[in-house]
């Protein structure tokens, strides 16, 4: 189960950057926003979308748009390719901690007899 989840999340991490740019472009087209209209804004920066509806610069965070669009929340930060190593480490840490906690719970259930102190 966890191996399957790990494989799926790894694939999402590889595909996510492509989907992010496509989702932002689709969002811009749907809201009639032209990209890179303002010459003072650097191409590729986070402030590169201009709203034609009210004529002011819209600050758009591409990653936030993608997170909100897919409902991933802050977990998406671990799925970015540059953080993939950290994500794998966190996943392994989580899996091993979960296994240790499970074993401790089982041991507590097996030995429900209270441990007495020696002097009593």
From Swiss-Prot:
GO CC entries: extracellular region; host cell cytoplasm; host cell nucleus
Motif (RxLR-dEER): 47-64
Signal peptide limits: 1-21
Reported induction: Expression is up-regulated at later stages of infection.
Compartment list: Secreted; Host cytoplasm; Host nucleus
Keyword Protein biosynthesis: no
Organism domain of life: Eukaryota
Predominant location: secreted
Alphabetic keyword roster: Host cytoplasm, Host nucleus, Secreted, Signal, Virulence
Free-text note on domains in this protein's UniProt record: The RxLR-dEER motif acts to carry the protein into the host cell cytoplasm through binding to cell surface phosphatidylinositol-3-phosphate.
Family: Belongs to the RxLR effector family.
Function: Effector that acts as a broad suppressor of cell death to interrupt plant immunity. Inhibits cell death induced by cell death-inducing proteins, including the PAMP elicitor INF1 from P.infestans.
Name under which the protein is recorded: Secreted RxLR effector protein 29
UniProt source species: Plasmopara viticola (Downy mildew of grapevine)
Gene: RxLR29
């Amino acid at each position: 189960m966890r191996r399957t989840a790990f494989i799926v999340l790894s694939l999402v991490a590889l595909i996510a950057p492509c989907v992010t740019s496509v989702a932002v472009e689709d969002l811009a087209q749907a809201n009639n926003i032209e990209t890179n209209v303002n010459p003072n804004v650097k191409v590729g920066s986070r402030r590169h979308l201009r709203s034609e509806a009210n004529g002011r610069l819209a600050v758009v965070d591409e990653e936030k748009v993608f997170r909100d669009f897919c409902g991933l929340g802050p977990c998406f930060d671990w799925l970015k390719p540059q953080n993939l190593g950290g994500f794998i480490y966190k996943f392994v840490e989580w899996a091993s901690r979960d296994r240790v906690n499970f074993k401790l719970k089982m041991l507590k259930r097996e030995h429900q007899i209270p441990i007495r102190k020696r002097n009593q």
